[in-house]
Amino acid sequence: MALYQEQSLKLYNSMSGEKETFTPINEGNVGMYVCGPTVYSNVHLGNCRTFMSFDLVFRYLKHLGYKVRYVRNITDAGHLENDADSGEDRIAKKARLEQIEPMEVVQKYTVDFHNILNKFNNYPPSIEPTATGHIVEQIEIIKTILDNGFAYEANGSVYFDVVKFNKEHSYGKLSGRAIEDMIANTRELSAQSDKRSPQDFALWKKAEPQHIMRWPSPWSDGFPGWHLECTVMSTKYLGEEFDIHGGGMDLKFPHHECEIAQGEAATGKSPVNYWLHANMLTLNGKKMAKSTGNFILPEQIFTGNNEVLTKAFSPNVVRFFVLQAHYRSILDFSSDALLGSEKGFNRLMDAYRSIEELPASDKSDFNLSEWKQSCYDAMNDDFNSPILIAKLFDAVKTINGIKDGSIQITDTDKEEFKATMSAFMFDILGLIDAASENKNEGDKLAGTIELLIKLRADARNNKDFALSDQIRDRLQEIGIQLKDGKEGTSFSVK
């Protein structure tokens, strides 16, 4: 029996505003789509929090035994400034300012994005499609929406008709906005606008002469609207109806609202069963955002090169800090908060490493199964990582109790205890036992040096003193000191 058949997972569905029991469309299989980055600059920590949150979701679903297809896109075209239907493409603007090709911008910041998430120990998605790789599919879905009567062409651009759509469906149901209120609170369209209503949004935009990112279409040489790519890529790889759609809270409106409208207009079906939204990271009490300059880059945290930091912090500690808050809660970033997380992280790791040396008894008075289920209960409650971490610190108290003899545990329970700690700390939370990794690296280094010492000894025995001295000198250059003695050669690392 798979774990998912034993555990009852509940998700907070943004559509209903309630926690709901998770039941995938196809038993044992999960389709999950998460909106990825627009790759025109380095990702900041606020962006990374969202992706760490959905990495936790991905990891736990896999742990439960689900076969998960996780799709996360790369936006490499069509995202205009201020998330609007007019203005300059963000990537094209960056290319113009740096005097390079747009795809050079895309390549540079996609590589940076992957490198940063790798440092945070995020699993890669199953599929990572790009907007520019799906232009044909985006044109085809626009044709379908036009044929179904929910869009119109104007001067080479195509717009989604929100008012007409709302007569048969419900635009605004995810964000809880009534279209009447939206109309009342929106300025009138300018005389130059091709839209019928201010709420309408672009499915295809005719490119201005200076717009260098353009593709041919039945309507004009132009580019797809930002909202369209996610509808196309999610449904292409997950089907017209799929299980989970995730993203930052700031994408709920208009991006996700528009995705729902496009999907329903094209297929008549609501595309997503569970909508999950991760909350923001704040700095100085305000939302972390590039547009306001109120952000911090991960590399600045790793090096300590930012005025808000008192020292550098490892990716491991930053991940632990992020997961100490529930993904739907606002999290405020500060150096003091990271210092607290670092202490907690080290305490947890030290306790885990000591399990192997715990004294075993003939009987256990530690209720292992109850504690283990409490860890699952935390994750089953909408991926409640802070409660899970609290349960792991309960385990630290138990470990200390076993050390001082106030709690007993058998060898069998000790093995299961360690395996359970490992599963929740490393497989699910995605933490890394850096000391163990460093020890493994240290063992590899020691083995390599011992081999060089042997080669040096062979050279000396063969009276090849030039090679012997070269090995000694090169090791010394990289901080490894050899010391010859009666018992042989030893080494120390400076």
From Swiss-Prot:
Keyword presence, Glycoprotein: no
Motif ('HIGH' region): 37-47
Signal peptide bounds: none
GO cellular component terms, A-Z: cytosol
Cofactor requirement: Zn(2+)
Co-factor binding comment: Binds 1 zinc ion per subunit.
Residues given in the record as ATP binding sites: K290
UniProt-annotated binding residues for Zn(2+): C35, C230, H255, E259
Enzyme Commission no: 6.1.1.16
UniProt short sequence motif 'KMSKS' region, positions renumbered to this chain: 287-291
GO biological process terms, semicolon-separated: cysteinyl-tRNA aminoacylation
Catalytically driven reaction(s): tRNA(Cys) + L-cysteine + ATP = L-cysteinyl-tRNA(Cys) + AMP + diphosphate
Chief place where the protein resides: cytoplasm
Subcellular location: Cytoplasm
Keyword entries, A-Z: Aminoacyl-tRNA synthetase, ATP-binding, Cytoplasm, Ligase, Metal-binding, Nucleotide-binding, Protein biosynthesis, Zinc
EC top class named in words: ligase
Similarity-based family: Belongs to the class-I aminoacyl-tRNA synthetase family.
Subunit and partners: Monomer.
HAMAP family found in the cross-reference section: Cys_tRNA_synth
Protein's name according to its UniProt entry: Cysteine--tRNA ligase
